């Protein structure tokens, strides 16, 4: 996506985004937090935090930071341009069959879009858990606020 390229995002891990993902994980108490940039054919985890409870095979699966656009829930968030709350992905037939359920073991998801000042949905800030989790309205408001905060940081970097 051209806008990601203009911003220098979506191709390389960024320690600042990893730190942001760590903070998102801390704030939400989620074991896995990501800043995910969505491109035409793939997703790239520009920021990644995997807490101590994440099993080794899951960590290994995340190491490359690149996934097909068909995997996960972030592409749905970008297309809808709205936050998505899945307390238990298995409760939603549309999402229960996603490859990340079997490959990574994701059971709950909370994500919000990163919509920049030009109106482009760059990707998401999201957290997942390997167990069902009631995120509730507080979780929704938190992830939306964190997404807005990150967009502001991206804009500030763009000006420098």
Label the predicted regions:
Residues 1-70, 138-140, 144-149, 153-160:
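Intrinsically disordered, low-complexity terminal regulatory regions
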Residues 38-44, 54-107:
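Regulatory sensory and allosteric helical modules in signal-transduction proteins
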Residues 35, 118-119:
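Glycine-biased flexible loop/turn sites that connect beta-strands or occur in inter-domain linkers
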Residues 108-116:
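A short, aliphatic-rich beta-strand micro-motif
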Residues 123-124, 143:
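PAS (Per-ARNT-Sim) sensory domains
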Residues 32, 74, 111, 124:
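Short hydrophobic/aromatic beta-strand element in the GNAT-like acyltransferase core
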Residues 80, 117-118:
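Residue-level recognition of short loop/turn positions
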Residues 124-133:
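Short beta-strand-to-loop transition segments that serve as allosteric relay/switch motifs
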């Amino acid at each position: 996506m051209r806008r990601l390229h203009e911003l220098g995002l979506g191709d390389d891990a960024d320690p600042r985004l990893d730190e942001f993902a760590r903070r998102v994980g801390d704030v939400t108490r989620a074991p896995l937090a990501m800043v995910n940039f969505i491109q035409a054919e793939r997703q790239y985890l520009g920021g990644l935090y995997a807490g101590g409870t994440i099993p080794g095979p899951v960590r290994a699966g995340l190491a490359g930071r690149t996934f097909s656009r068909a995997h996960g829930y972030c592409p749905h968030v970008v297309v809808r341009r709205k936050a998505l709350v899945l307390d238990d992905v298995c409760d939603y037939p549309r999402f229960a069959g996603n490859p990340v359920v079997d490959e990574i073991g994701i059971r709950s998801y909370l994500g919000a879009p990163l919509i920049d000042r030009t109106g482009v949905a760059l990707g998401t800030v999201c957290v997942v858990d390997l167990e069902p989790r009631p995120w509730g309205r507080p979780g929704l408001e938190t992830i939306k606020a964190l997404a807005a905060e990150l967009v502001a940081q991206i804009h500030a970097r763009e000006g420098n």
